[in-house]
């Protein structure tokens, strides 16, 4: 039987890469997104696109829209591609037996997406993660007296509201939603893993080569150290999870990987996995070893890289400008394809909705692109108000206990 995959956001390059991989494997791909026009809407890999209600302001409408698309389009596979994974996981128990949800369950999302609960879980699995506390915890004051720290939202994404503070700094008002974490000095490494029934089938590692704020827009493939492979395998073992898992690591001077956060979803590492293998793997039909780009291969979002280059030029930041230009001229564009050119050609008008939101509301473009779908901007109580399921079926972010790594 022919399979139809529904991607629940299509505005990002990672979703486009996944759509192309699924299409190459013979899967019919449809996309739902609160944006009327987005990258996937003009792709040859996508059969249909649907504009749906934004889940952060109309969760009930969004759920109705997704369930309606699943029924009308005979969707066999429901696949989240970005921060909307939290909403999709909550919806998954309501799917019929003919539709498969591809991603972590709400139970796992609550433990992995929450940056405090993530550290608790990682330590319980015997892997390394730096100590973290809410600013309401007395231990946070002791920590900032001892060492440099990172201040960040408990459910943030895309580097939102992240700041580094020196020892002895004054903490912001106590909050259960703001975290203070020990800063680990070392080299950053990002990973994307495809996990099937709790078994890691492929991992692509990469580093950011060009950044817009704290968000990487240029990427360089990197080898995956054995210690990182072990860390990921130990983290997901016995979970039974099938889906994409992304991790941010810092490797200290001893080579020890410290897990900073988990994004239980697709990420830019997908640009370093062969599309044909990727599409087959997501459908549970892959054979042979995954094809991962060799270390040193580069990819970029060239429009974003060019924007950063202009910014550095106007600010006379010559070293940063040179780095941007190097990426611009030597890196493969993650969106461009001779067989599917329109997403690249039309990228600026297709992204105009959140570009304009960024200008109008004076917020970073990363925030503007996520604020209608990501849990960082979602009020959990709002979902309880509209959902008809029992409380046990609704994922609630836990208030975990702080633990030292």
Go through each PLM region and give its residues.
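ATP-binding N-terminal substructure of ATP-dependent carboxylate-amine bond-forming enzymes
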Residues: 1-103, 398
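Phosphate-binding site of ATP-dependent enzymes
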Residues: 162-231, 250-259
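Glycine-rich phosphate/pyrophosphate-binding beta-alpha loops
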Residues: 159, 210-214, 219, 263-277
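A conserved helix-loop-beta module that forms one wall/lid of the active-site cleft
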Residues: 47, 95-166
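Conserved metal-phosphate-binding beta-hairpin within the catalytic cores
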Residues: 237-272
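Peripheral (often C-terminal) accessory segments that flank ATP-dependent C-N-forming ligase machineries
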Residues: 281-405
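Hydrophobic anchor at the start of a short beta-strand
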Residues: 27-30, 129-130, 149, 178
């Amino acid at each position: 039987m022919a399979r139809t995959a529904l991607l629940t956001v299509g505005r990002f390059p990672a979703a486009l890469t996944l759509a192309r991989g699924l299409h190459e494997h013979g899967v019919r791909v449809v996309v739902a997104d609160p944006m009327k026009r987005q990258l996937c809407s003009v792709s040859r890999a996508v059969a249909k696109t649907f504009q749906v209600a934004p889940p952060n302001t109309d969760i009930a409408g969004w759920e109705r829209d997704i369930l309606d698309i699943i029924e009308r389009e005979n969707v066999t596979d429901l696949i989240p591609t970005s921060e909307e994974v939290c909403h999709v996981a909550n919806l998954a128990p309501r799917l019929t037996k003919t539709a498969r949800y591809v991603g972590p369950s709400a139970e796992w999302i609550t433990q992995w997406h929450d940056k405090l609960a993530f550290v608790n879980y990682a330590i319980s699995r015997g892997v390394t993660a730096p100590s973290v506390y809410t600013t309401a915890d007395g231990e946070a004051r002791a920590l900032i007296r001892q060492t440099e720290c990172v201040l960040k939202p408990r459910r943030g994404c895309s580097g939102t509201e992240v700041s580094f503070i020196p020892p002895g700094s004054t903490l912001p008002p106590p909050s259960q939603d703001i975290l203070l974490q020990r800063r680990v000095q070392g080299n950053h490494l990002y990973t994307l893993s495809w996990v099937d029934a709790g078994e890691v089938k492929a991992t692509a590692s990469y580093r950011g080569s060009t950044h817009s704020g704290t968000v990487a827009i240029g990427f360089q493939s990197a080898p995956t150290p054995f210690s990182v492979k072990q860390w990921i395998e130990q983290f997901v073992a016995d979970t039974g999870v099938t889906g994409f898992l992304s991790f941010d690591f810092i490797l200290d001077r001893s080579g020890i990987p410290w897990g900073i956060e988990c994004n239980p979803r697709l990420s830019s590492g997908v640009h370093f996995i062969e599309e044909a293998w990727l599409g087959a793997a997501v459908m549970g039909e892959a054979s042979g070893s995954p094809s991962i780009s060799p270390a040193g291969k580069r990819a970029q979002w060239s429009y974003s890289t060019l924007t950063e280059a202009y910014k550095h030029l106007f600010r006379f930041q010559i070293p940063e400008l040179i780095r941007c230009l190097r990426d611009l001229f030597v890196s493969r564009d993650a969106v461009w394809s001779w067989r599917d050119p329109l997403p690249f050609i039309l990228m600026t008008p297709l992204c105009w909705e959140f570009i304009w939101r960024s200008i109008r509301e004076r917020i970073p473009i990363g925030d503007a692109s996520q604020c209608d779908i990501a849990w960082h901007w979602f009020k959990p109580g709002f979902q309880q108000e509209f959902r008809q399921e029992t409380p046990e079926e609704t994922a609630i972010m836990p208030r975990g206990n702080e633990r030292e790594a």
